[in-house]
Structure formats: structure tokens, C-alpha cells
Regions:
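Conserved C-terminal structural/oligomerization subdomain of aldehyde/semialdehyde dehydrogenase
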Residues: 1-99
Length: 99
């Protein structure tokens, strides 16, 4: 299904689900996890649901892209992070001195 592919859009897919647990299971049942979106009239409920989704970034109610926040995916959707302090750390090499 479209939920199993890493597609680039803009694309809107609509998949029926029974309840929030089923919706989270469908969203997380993929080897990819770059980004996603959650919309709800209840902002707190949307944020709680967004935390359950295994993606590197997720928009809540159409939130704008934040270039200061780390960007990158989970699972097979990329390695590491860009932007923000986590992105900066990708360029550091850590050394442990054993004295």
C-alpha cells in the first residue's frame, strides 16, 4: 500500500482506521519514518498522538518547518540529523583520553 512506500509529494493519502491505536499502528507499520502530520481540533490530543508516531519530524495542525530543529528520519529514512545542535554534532568526532 501507499503507507509502505517512501513517497515524496505533496501527497495526501487517506486510510480508514478503527481508533487511535489502529491509526498509530498503521502509521508505524513501515520501514520508513521521515515525516508525518497530525490534525485535530484538540491540540493537546494531537501532540500526544504525534509522540506515538515513529518519524523524525511530525507537523501538528500544519506547523511550519523550523530550521533550528534537528531534521532527519527514523528507520530506513536517513541516517543522522541536519540543522540545530544535533545536526552540528554530526560533524564532531569524539575522543576519549585514557590516562
Amino acid at each position: 500500500t501507499i503507507a509502505q512506500e517512501e513517497i515524496f509529494g505533496p501527497v495526501l493519502s487517506i486510510i480508514a482506521y478503527e481508533d487511535e491505536d489502529d491509526a498509530a499502528a498503521i502509521a508505524n507499520d513501515s520501514v520508513y519514518g521521515l515525516s508525518g502530520g497530525v490534525w485535530s481540533a484538540d491540540g493537546e490530543r494531537a501532540k500526544a498522538f504525534a509522540r506515538r508516531i515513529r518519524t523524525g519530524q511530525i507537523e501538528v495542525n500544519g506547523g511550519a518547518f523550523n530550521a533550528s530543529a534537528p531534521f532527519g528520519g527514523y528507520k530506513n529514512s536517513g541516517y543522522g540529523r541536519e540543522y540545530g545542535p544535533h545536526g552540528f554534532e554530526e560533524f564532531l568526532e569524539i575522543k576519549s583520553l585514557q590516562l
